[in-house]
Regions:
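Charge-rich, low-complexity N-terminal segments
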Residues: 2-148
């Protein structure tokens, strides 16, 4: 019996965390300085649960382990314990200087705000999802009370 016969779309959410520092190039407030966050990322996907009785994924939209692998490979492994800087001529010299001492400096082609990081993360995750599964939403916390 398929209990999902009338429930066509289900959403799944998994939470991830990583530590990273960034600086907002040219910003007119305190966040222009290098500072860090304990990021919490909530990834929600949607799809229809597999219905085939012989299907090993019967009743699942997606294996949580697969979602974990995708997000860890695309996001967490790159950004955890990193310094994220916008790719600019000024930051290129800063990056070169810092790279002599520190290893995980990530340069991006956007201002590394919470909002822009979400756009980047959405592209990275979406292209890896299995057929029939879509990215529904992302929520990225920079602090316990601030998120996009």
């Amino acid at each position: 019996m398929n209990i999902f016969a009338h429930m066509t779309v289900i959403r799944l959410t998994k939470e991830f965390s990583f530590e990273a520092a960034h600086a907002l190039d040219g910003y007119d407030g305190p966040c222009r300085e290098i500072h860090g966050h304990s990021y919490r990322l909530f990834v929600t996907v949607k799809g229809c649960p597999a219905a085939g009785e012989g299907d090993p994924k019967c009743g699942m939209v997606m294996d949580f382990g697969v979602l974990k692998r995708i997000v860890n490979e695309e996001i967490v492994s790159h950004f955890d314990h990193s310094l994220v800087l916008r790719q600019t001529p000024c930051n290129a010299s800063l990056r070169a200087m810092l790279a002599e001492r520190f290893g995980n400096i990530v340069t991006v082609d956007y201002q590394p705000t919470c909002e822009n990081m979400l756009g980047d993360f959405a592209r990275r995750i979406s292209r890896r999802l299995p057929e029939g599964v879509e990215l529904y939403s992302l929520r990225l916390h920079e602090t316990a009370t601030s998120f996009a």
